């Protein structure tokens, strides 16, 4: 399995997992609140030697929860965390543990001059062997 195939599989599984927990994943038009955006990085392959033909790939997964109010953002953040906590996505023939590595509490985001939104950011890490 190639790294790009794994990336596509992880991204699709992430969106499906969130949708199954009734979390609206942002589409091209951000016209309704609340929603979450997801960013899955290109995998990093460390130079470690595993002693066989396998390679370890590590993905960074970032989520940004967006709501019109702080309460809306907090409620959606709880659903996102519930969906991803202890989730073990399948890659290849095995499932792998997703780790929650960082979280920023909801905060008012004043970067958008035409609207008032609250955002919360979380970082997750997923390492797989292929």
Q: What spans do the regions from the language model cover?
A:
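Low-complexity, flexible helical/coil segments
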Residues: 59, 71-79, 96-100
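Small/polar-rich, solvent-exposed N-terminal microdomains that initiate assembly or binding
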Residues: 1-51, 87-97
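Acidic-leaning, charged glycine-interspersed low-complexity segments
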Residues: 82-130
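Mid-chain, well-packed structural core segment of small domains
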Residues: 67-89
């Amino acid at each position: 399995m190639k790294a790009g195939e794994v990336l596509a599989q992880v991204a699709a599984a992430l969106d499906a997992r969130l949708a199954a927990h009734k979390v609206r994943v942002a589409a091209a038009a951000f016209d309704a609140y609340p929603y979450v955006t997801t960013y899955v990085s290109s995998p990093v392959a460390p130079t470690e030697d595993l002693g066989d033909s396998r390679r370890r790939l590590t993905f960074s997964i970032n989520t940004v929860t967006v709501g019109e109010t702080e309460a809306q953002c907090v409620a959606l953040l709880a659903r996102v965390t519930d969906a991803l906590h202890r989730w073990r996505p399948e890659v290849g023939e095995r499932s792998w543990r997703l780790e929650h590595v960082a979280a920023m509490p909801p905060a008012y985001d004043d970067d958008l001059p035409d609207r008032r939104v609250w955002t919360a950011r979380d970082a997750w890490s997923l390492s797989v062997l292929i």
